[in-house]
């Protein structure tokens, strides 16, 4: 929110707390529990049950799949079936790395237009999967999995971060320069289109309002060419569903400094537990 982001699409194994936290802060969220067979068939079944529990309780979300290559065909089919029963899509990591190059063949009979296909780095141009491809340039570079070249896809393409922050203007700039490195004819308007596709995933966010600092020219408040080369743009005020949730750069519903202080206190305990695993 302090970066002007008012919607979150999250794949996690703690979907109830995340949804509650987002509601407390005042932003929109869509959650999915990422099922996997890495812990055996029973683990995948429990993951599906958690997705169903969340969605039937009224949570906004999708059925989550950690990554196609960590799931059996039976689990993928079960996830697709549950999503169809609940009238939601599937949120799945697809062909992020070379280990998942067979994902398209496995998912093609299952995927529908309401699916989110995350990464898609190693998909063929004509992969034949229905759904929206979500491009995560910073994450892909960090993991050294390659460049997805998202402009090649016939699918709608949206922009994401894979959990590395929530500064979507910064992600837009990175998406543009990475595209430009690959294709000298690339324009900031291409990457801006990927960013704007997020509204198709959360149509109600069209009614939310963000005012920015420094103040943009009235004639071109969100010009892709200007923003591609202007860093340091930050939100001054954020309104979600008519409510001001950020005023003068500060959250109105919660004490952000207190939250950070409590997180700093708990971080060493978490690190110690991880060391003990």
Residue ranges of each PLM-predicted region?
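Short, hydrophobic beta-strand segments that form beta-sheet elements in well-ordered domains
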Residues: 7-11, 116-122, 135, 195-201, ...
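Active-site loop-helix segments enriched in His/Asp/Glu that coordinate
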Residues: 1-60, 66-82
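Active-site microenvironment of metallo-dependent hydrolases
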Residues: 193-277
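Flexible loop residues that form catalytic
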Residues: 13, 120-121, 138, 180, ...
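Ligand/cofactor pocket segment of small-molecule handling proteins
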Residues: 167-170, 174, 182-193, 197, ...
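Active-site core of metal-dependent hydrolases
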Residues: 57-169, 179-188
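Short, hinge-like loop/turn segments at secondary-structure boundaries
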Residues: 24-29, 46-49, 107-109, 150-153, ...
